[in-house]
Amino acid sequence: MAPSIQSLSMIHDSQECIKPIPAFYCCYLLRSCVRHASLYIGSTPDPARRLAQHNGDRNGAAKRTLRENLRPWEMVAIVSGFTSRVAALQFEWAWQNTKVSRHADLDGNAIQELGVRICPRTGKGVKGTAKPRTSLTNILANLHLLLRSPYFSKWPVEVRFFSADVHRVWQVWLQRVDGLLNDGIRVVTDFALDGISEVERKELLAGAGRVGTLDVGYNSIKEYVEKSQFLLEDGERINCGVSHLSCLSSHFLKDKDSDSELIPREGTCPACYGKLEWLTMMKEISLRLRGQEEVNRLFRRRRQAGTPKGQGLKSVRGRGRGRGHSEDESDALQVSTGLDIVDLTPCSDDPWTIDCAIGELGGIAHRPGGESSGNDSDATITLEMETPPQRRRRNQNTRTQRLGLQKSATINLSDWDDAEVIE
């Protein structure tokens, strides 16, 4: 049965709606600065903006973070590297509901031990029962369990800690469990709010702290995209290596001797033997094929401060075109400065015959007291500058005189018409 026109249009619309791999998407863990037992798990493509929403600086906070007695909130850890919004939401739900998630191995789960709690300050175990959902130890244990699962352990994710006490709980838990994380999962520490006063801590939290320094755009692969555009401009002659995605994936997996994986994490280029990350390559390809708007935004030049919005590059180039200025530009410069360019080169060997050089421009050279003196070292030159109206009248007279000279020269040249031809 042939597809209908409506189904074809739906397929076309769905292809147009396909977006490139997002530049950044993460799952985060919030902790109340007032009550450390209050924790929250969420996901966002912009952690700094989302943190401002939770703290009430922007609209759009979650219902559980609206209570003023729990604000401000701090972002203590994030898990980034998701290739889509759906993948981040899937991991977020599994982190929030680890017990009912199909990716968690509950048989060998050490979280089920009752009374297991680790103090963030000392790093020692605390006796007594605690609510699994509000315990920091339980949340980090769930995170460790998901990252060891067969499903999420293949993902190119990265765990980043912004708080030293939370990272201490994480390290203590690693010593209590037998399972280890995959070598491809990186754990990074980025402490900036520890070892400072409470006032400085609140100021950093108001500005999102170290969370605001995260690169949530495509700036990290800007040079990569620019290089690919430069090499692919000439479609007939490409000097770099080209291969199918399936062939390149097989080449990367062959180097690692891995039969269970279908998508590699990284590999070696067969041409230059350089290290290539699969996520970076796929992000560049999807950005080049599906994200033309993102590419234009990435290479858009920022307008300089103080430059009018409607001023283009053409008007800027016109400022420095040539060394000279037009007549209108020179007049405008003279009116704005109020000064004339005076040539003080003497007309003869006598330095006091400068009247002939500057007399046409309205300058008067004289000695102090109006008397001539034999001592040249005591002589001074005083220039009387013209006012703009006088200068304009003088310029008009000068132009009239020039036009008169040109007419007279033309008349004199016409006298050759009456000349006799001598044979």
From Swiss-Prot:
Pfam families: GIY-YIG, SLX1_C. One of its GO terms (biological process) is double-strand break repair via homologous recombination. PROSITE patterns: GIY_YIG. It is found in: Nucleus. Its cofactor is a divalent metal cation. Its EC number is 3.1.-.-. GO terms for cellular component: Slx1-Slx4 complex. Keywords: DNA damage, DNA recombination, DNA repair, Endonuclease, Hydrolase, Nuclease, Nucleus. Residues 23-105 form the GIY-YIG domain. One of its GO terms (molecular function) is 5'-flap endonuclease activity. Transmembrane segments: none annotated. It comes from the Eukaryota. Catalytic subunit of the SLX1-SLX4 structure-specific endonuclease that resolves DNA secondary structures generated during DNA repair and recombination. Has endonuclease activity towards branched DNA substrates, introducing single-strand cuts in duplex DNA close to junctions with ss-DNA. Forms a heterodimer with SLX4. Belongs to the SLX1 family. This is Structure-specific endonuclease subunit SLX1. The lineage of its organism: Eukaryota, Fungi, Dikarya, Ascomycota, Pezizomycotina. The gene is SLX1.
